[in-house]
Amino acid sequence: MIELIDVLASDGQPAGIRKPKDAVHRDGDWHRAAHIWIMAPDGRILLQRRSLRKENNPGLWDVSTAGHLSAGESAVEAAVRETFEEIGLAIPAGALEFVTTLRESSVLNGGRYIDNEFHEIFVVRREVDLDALRLDPEEVAEVKWVRDLRPDETFVPHAEEYALLSRLRRPGAQRRA
């Protein structure tokens, strides 16, 4: 089945167009994605290493879970869906703390994959038993908890998001709207 994505204007407003996901990335259309950061009560952060089968950034460490918003889907709906699909964790919508929206643009794979996204950033504060997770091998190679987030060349480049996350990782941290 072809996944359709709502195309946005560069200011984030709906363009009134739906396109297949591969066409969105081929053409460099702006679109939305949900990024879900899972944090343990003690401040540890859950990271995923992207599957080597992924078209973009294979094998790199990344956000706990993430994914495109399907056409007509809300960011909360996408966050709940993607977390379950990628790592088998059911997150109630009420557990998602919306933090902010970040705009990010990258060109990958020799210009064949243009990723112009508005990232809807969420935090979920809860303990997770890694052994109980069911990883989708098409999406996720492995997961791990880290106490100190130190992005380097083994991470998907999300500089602004990592900086924001380092401020939010403290228990009781205030979210930014």
Task: Go through each PLM region and give its residues.
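A residue-level structural signature of the nucleotidyltransferase/glycosyltransferase Rossmann-like core
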Residues: 5, 28, 44-45, 132, ...
